[in-house]
């Protein structure tokens, strides 16, 4: 959209009003004016808080304005080949210079556990489960997460994953539940069928039995999952919301 423009010119173009966009004043319906005022607030914020980063030069603290920030959110245009290089450079800089140890992802609890398991083990089966969510971006995602796995090993395993989204694929979420389960512990008889389905990777059956077990056998589920039970509860809540939606 803003080809051949500098970052400053692109921001200015984004904040153009109907009067300034083409040099002529245009009548604007009232509903459009209301929406325009909302957009002006967004554009003003972006204009006041945007710092262009040029990838021909190394990143430095000044690129981020305030070195005390603890959360960094980056946008991207999906499908662009430079995205992966940007993500690598950004995370490596933030980890080494700003102490960032957590990679945020747009996934729910279960799907995030699949990624976390890959990051801990390097087992490609876990990565492949996650890639089912990525569609046409699967190749770029695979490249990034394989890089992050190797980088995390070099950093002593100090990097973790946290999900901020919803459960998009219930089968993948069930694999996340499998990652939370302790395969060495024998479950109570009341939830044995659920655990067996999970271990057999019969995920559609496990999904139905999981919902029943959480409703009817919460104590047995808490005993089986132990310290991970809070995450299991959040996964169950996420699935309920998704089903309702």
Model-found features: residue ranges?
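Structured catalytic-domain cores with a bias toward divalent-metal coordination
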Residues: 2-6, 14, 19, 23-25, ...
